[in-house]
Amino acid sequence: PEIVDPTAINIHGTIHKKVPNAKCILHVHSKYATALSCLKDPNLPPIDQNTMRFYNRVGVYNEFGGLGFEEESEKMANSIGNHNILLLANHGILTVAPTVAQAFDDLFYFEKACETYITALSAGKLPRRVPL
Protein backbone atom coordinates (compact mmCIF):
# COMPACT_ATOMS: atom_id res chain seq x y z
CA PRO A 1 0.00 0.00 0.00
CA GLU A 2 1.02 3.59 -0.61
CA ILE A 3 2.17 5.57 2.42
CA VAL A 4 -0.02 8.57 1.56
CA ASP A 5 -3.37 8.33 -0.20
CA PRO A 6 -2.94 10.04 -3.61
CA THR A 7 -6.40 11.62 -3.35
CA ALA A 8 -5.37 13.27 -0.07
CA ILE A 9 -2.24 14.65 -1.72
CA ASN A 10 -4.34 15.98 -4.61
CA ILE A 11 -6.92 17.66 -2.40
CA HIS A 12 -4.58 19.08 0.22
CA GLY A 13 -1.87 20.05 -2.27
CA THR A 14 -4.31 21.90 -4.50
CA ILE A 15 -5.88 23.73 -1.56
CA HIS A 16 -2.45 24.73 -0.23
CA LYS A 17 -1.62 26.17 -3.68
CA LYS A 18 -4.91 27.98 -4.30
CA VAL A 19 -6.02 29.17 -0.85
CA PRO A 20 -3.52 31.66 0.64
CA ASN A 21 -4.56 31.26 4.30
CA ALA A 22 -4.57 27.44 4.11
CA LYS A 23 -1.35 26.77 6.00
CA CYS A 24 -3.21 24.03 7.89
CA ILE A 25 -5.96 21.83 6.44
CA LEU A 26 -7.97 19.45 8.61
CA HIS A 27 -10.41 16.95 7.10
CA VAL A 28 -12.70 14.77 9.19
CA HIS A 29 -15.84 12.67 8.97
CA SER A 30 -17.17 13.75 12.36
CA LYS A 31 -20.60 12.46 13.38
CA TYR A 32 -22.71 15.62 13.38
CA ALA A 33 -21.00 17.60 10.61
CA THR A 34 -21.26 14.53 8.38
CA ALA A 35 -24.94 14.17 9.29
CA LEU A 36 -25.44 17.83 8.31
CA SER A 37 -23.59 17.21 5.04
CA CYS A 38 -26.12 14.47 4.21
CA LEU A 39 -29.16 16.76 4.49
CA LYS A 40 -30.89 18.07 1.37
CA ASP A 41 -30.24 21.58 2.72
CA PRO A 42 -26.88 21.38 4.53
CA ASN A 43 -26.79 25.05 5.53
CA LEU A 44 -26.44 25.62 9.26
CA PRO A 45 -29.05 28.13 10.46
CA PRO A 46 -28.48 30.41 13.46
CA ILE A 47 -30.38 28.73 16.30
CA ASP A 48 -28.01 29.34 19.23
CA GLN A 49 -24.67 30.98 20.02
CA ASN A 50 -22.57 28.17 18.52
CA THR A 51 -24.51 28.05 15.25
CA MET A 52 -24.52 31.86 15.01
CA ARG A 53 -20.72 31.80 14.91
CA PHE A 54 -20.84 29.89 11.62
CA TYR A 55 -23.86 31.53 9.97
CA ASN A 56 -22.96 32.38 6.35
CA ARG A 57 -19.33 31.40 7.04
CA VAL A 58 -19.37 27.84 5.65
CA GLY A 59 -18.88 26.86 2.03
CA VAL A 60 -20.82 23.89 0.70
CA TYR A 61 -19.41 21.62 -1.97
CA ASN A 62 -22.32 19.66 -3.44
CA GLU A 63 -20.39 17.95 -6.23
CA PHE A 64 -18.32 15.57 -4.11
CA GLY A 65 -18.05 12.34 -6.08
CA GLY A 66 -16.14 10.20 -3.61
CA LEU A 67 -12.53 10.49 -4.74
CA GLY A 68 -10.50 13.68 -4.90
CA PHE A 69 -8.58 13.36 -8.11
CA GLU A 70 -7.11 16.39 -9.89
CA GLU A 71 -10.28 17.87 -11.41
CA GLU A 72 -12.25 17.30 -8.20
CA SER A 73 -9.45 18.89 -6.16
CA GLU A 74 -9.56 22.05 -8.29
CA LYS A 75 -13.33 22.34 -7.84
CA MET A 76 -13.04 21.84 -4.09
CA ALA A 77 -10.32 24.47 -3.74
CA ASN A 78 -12.39 26.94 -5.76
CA SER A 79 -15.44 26.23 -3.58
CA ILE A 80 -13.66 27.30 -0.40
CA GLY A 81 -13.69 30.93 -1.51
CA ASN A 82 -13.26 33.14 1.55
CA HIS A 83 -14.56 30.49 3.97
CA ASN A 84 -12.52 28.61 6.57
CA ILE A 85 -14.89 25.65 6.51
CA LEU A 86 -16.02 23.60 3.52
CA LEU A 87 -18.84 21.12 4.00
CA LEU A 88 -18.48 18.21 1.57
CA ALA A 89 -21.92 16.89 0.62
CA ASN A 90 -22.53 13.37 1.95
CA HIS A 91 -18.97 13.16 3.22
CA GLY A 92 -17.63 15.44 5.97
CA ILE A 93 -15.79 18.73 6.34
CA LEU A 94 -12.52 20.53 5.68
CA THR A 95 -11.23 23.41 7.75
CA VAL A 96 -8.45 25.68 6.56
CA ALA A 97 -6.56 28.27 8.57
CA PRO A 98 -3.17 29.94 8.98
CA THR A 99 -2.46 27.83 12.11
CA VAL A 100 -3.28 24.39 13.48
CA ALA A 101 -4.93 26.04 16.50
CA GLN A 102 -7.31 28.09 14.35
CA ALA A 103 -8.19 25.16 12.09
CA PHE A 104 -8.86 22.94 15.10
CA ASP A 105 -10.91 25.63 16.87
CA ASP A 106 -13.20 25.90 13.83
CA LEU A 107 -13.37 22.12 13.52
CA PHE A 108 -14.24 21.59 17.19
CA TYR A 109 -16.86 24.33 17.49
CA PHE A 110 -18.43 23.59 14.11
CA GLU A 111 -18.97 20.00 15.23
CA LYS A 112 -20.60 21.31 18.45
CA ALA A 113 -22.83 23.62 16.40
CA CYS A 114 -23.83 20.73 14.13
CA GLU A 115 -24.58 18.60 17.19
CA THR A 116 -26.97 21.25 18.49
CA TYR A 117 -28.72 21.60 15.13
CA ILE A 118 -29.01 17.86 14.41
CA THR A 119 -30.29 17.27 17.97
CA ALA A 120 -32.87 20.04 17.55
CA LEU A 121 -34.02 18.51 14.25
CA SER A 122 -34.45 15.14 15.96
CA ALA A 123 -37.40 16.62 17.90
CA GLY A 124 -39.31 16.44 14.63
CA LYS A 125 -39.97 20.18 14.40
CA LEU A 126 -38.04 22.98 12.76
CA PRO A 127 -35.86 24.84 15.26
CA ARG A 128 -36.52 28.50 15.98
CA ARG A 129 -33.95 30.74 14.26
CA VAL A 130 -32.21 33.57 16.06
CA PRO A 131 -33.22 36.78 14.25
CA LEU A 132 -30.10 38.38 12.82
Residue ranges of predicted features:
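Glycine-rich flexible loops
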Residues: 1-132
